[in-house]
Amino acid sequence: MSLGLYLHIPYCFSKCRYCDFYSHPGERGVPDAYVEALVRELDRFAPERPLQPDTLYFGGGTPSLLRPEQAKRLIDAARPLPGAEITLEANPETVTEQSLAGFREAGVNRISFGVQSARDTQLRTLGRPHTAKQAKAAFAAARRAGFANISGDIMLALPHYTEAEFDETLELIEDGGATHISAYLLKIEPDSAFGKHPPEGLPTGDEAADFYLYAVGQLEHHGYRQYEISNFAKPGYEGRHNLIYWDCGDYLGLGPAAHSCMGGRRFYYPPDTAAFLNDAAAPVMDGSCGAEDYLILQLRLRKGLSLDAYKQLYGKEFSTAQLAFVQNCVRAGYASFDGHTLALTPAGLIVQNSILAQLL
């Protein structure tokens, strides 16, 4: 079975106003002691043989604050399988052609840039520290450094949002050579700066849904095939790491606030970097991964839920009432169903939570 490895890098220049992830703003680099703490945990989970993950994902925080030699130290400790996908999230303002070439030499073969918008005024509203010019330069530097697998993030339904802003951002990312795009609706998290002081000019729920459908159409038109609610790729460039999550595979997350599911059991590290550094943060068990998780995660994917696999894995079948509800969804344009596979359309993905409430 495939194994995905996630390494959390909780350091960043500044906290974006929409972000509620566990991180430490005001940092200009990653302490070597933190890297060694991650190596310690890698050794702990694989005392007799290396983990050899199929995918390795550096998330954050801002993982591009790592020095290339630190990334190499972690990759060497994990010993990923030949052909593994190794992704590094990066903020455009933190990279140079030299640093990107160093990451490439260290073993990183996929880079993911947090672009969000091509408009500097919007970036300032979001609290992003980069400019559109820096985003363009980062894509160009990544290509020159030898990256052929490049992803870019777009945020939708931002304050005073327009379709023109989306088009400008898509153009920047596509012209940059992106093979993959993640497009997310802005979500106001209670513990974020936006949660405490919401920005003016936010779209209504209906307007946000329209922006989402517009984005899906434009991305598909430009050759980025939708394979998950928020993810689009050129053929063959789907993000393998996140597919392990959505297909309910095994994944190990290391670092404060990192979550895992191994052998059907969930656990996580407490969000406490000091305790993690001092080897005083044992993982906390957090229940099991079961049939409900499988249904929820599979219906995020455009390929949908195989009812045959659902029955084979969990012994579950849809009831007569559930099947009747599915047919109602098909008639409403929210889903397709051939008797074996239930898949949500883009319109259905927008109201996925309401659909799941009837199926669970």
Functional labels for PLM-detected ranges:
Residues 1-9:
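Immediate flanking context of iron-sulfur cluster ligation sites
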Residues 2, 23-47, 54-316, 337:
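C-terminal scaffold of the Radical SAM
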Residues 10-23:
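Local cysteine-cluster metal-coordination motifs and their immediate loop/turn environment
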Residues 13, 306-307, 352:
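Internal amphipathic alpha-helical segments of the cytochrome P450 catalytic fold
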Residues 316-328:
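Short amphipathic alpha-helical interaction segments
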Residues 331-340:
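A short, conserved structural fragment
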Residues 341-345:
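Minor-groove-contacting beta-hairpin "wing" of winged helix-turn-helix DNA-binding domains
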Residues 347-360:
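Short, amphipathic alpha-helical interaction segments positioned at domain boundaries
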